[in-house]
Every structure is written in C-alpha cells, then in structure tokens.
From Swiss-Prot:
GO terms for cellular component: chloroplast; cytosolic large ribosomal subunit. The lineage of its organism: Eukaryota, Cryptophyceae, Pyrenomonadales, Geminigeraceae, Guillardia. This is Large ribosomal subunit protein uL6c. Part of the 50S ribosomal subunit. It comes from Guillardia theta (Cryptophyte). GO terms for molecular function: rRNA binding; structural constituent of ribosome. It is found in: Plastid, Chloroplast. The gene is rpl6.
Amino acid sequence: MSRIGKLPVKFSEKVTMKIDQDNIIVKGPKGELALGLSKNINITIENNTLFVKPVTKEPQVLKLFGTYRAIINNMVVGVTKGFEKRLELQGVGYRAQLQGKDLSLSVGYSHPVVIKAPTGINIAVENNTIVIISGISKELVGQIASNIRSIKPPEPYKGKGIRYVGEFVRKKAGKAGKK
C-alpha cells in the first residue's frame, strides 16, 4: 500500500468537488480543474475530506492510487493558492519582455524567441531578467517553465543561460592551455 495514497486530502469550504462517472472536478476561488479517473480507484468524500482507495490489490493499481491522491491534492492546492515557478536569465544582454500575453526572450540568438502563453497560465517579467510563470495546474506551470528553460539551459563554463531561481549549476574548469 502506498503511504501517500493512504493519507486523506483535506480541503476548505471554498473548494467544491464533484465526482462524475469517470471524472473528478475541483472548483475553487482561482478556477476549476478536472481529472479523468481509473475504474480501479474508488474515491469517497466525507465532510471536506477526500479518501482514495484501490478497488483491487493488483500491483499496478496499488502504484496508481498514491499517484491519484497526489494529483488530486495538487488540484486542491492549485484552485486555492495556485502554483508559481521563477526563472532567471543570466548572461550579458539576456533579457525577457512581455508582448501582450506572449513572452519574448533575447538570449544570444540572432532573433528573439517568442513563447505564447497557453490558457490558464500567466507570465510576468521582473527586472527584465526574472520570468514568473503562475497558474492553477502544477503540471502545466512546470511544463511551461521547463520548455522556457530548455531554450537556453545554463552552460557549465560560465553559467550563462536560463535557470530556475535558486538552481545550482555545477561549473567546469576551462582547458589548461599552453605553458
């Protein structure tokens, strides 16, 4: 049995959960999220607490039920508080700008790279070098942040590139040269 799956998901009165045949819909002050459910997972709600239980004891089902509990918990946190990822641009001349809802990055290429913000994601820029991605879906916020970082990941010699705020980049020594 999954240790995470056994834990209940507690939510406030601001959050409403509705279970259809194959879906769970979580509504809160920041928005609404939906998740398709497996037939092998049983979900019960009792006084603002959600319980996830496996229907059978098959190994695949036991692996899934902890994952479902974690995803539903992330949905509850997302519709109440939301999620945020911060990226920083390091390098001479590296800067970010907003053009409407799109993000334009100047990161050493001959042209600016433009990223369109999908629905449900807000992108903000601080001091031209910090990009803030926020939204209610933890998965989508993380995926967009990862896509932006992959445009110019930090290189190991000088550390130039796009990185998460607080990310440690291991640096290499340059070549020794002639003596």
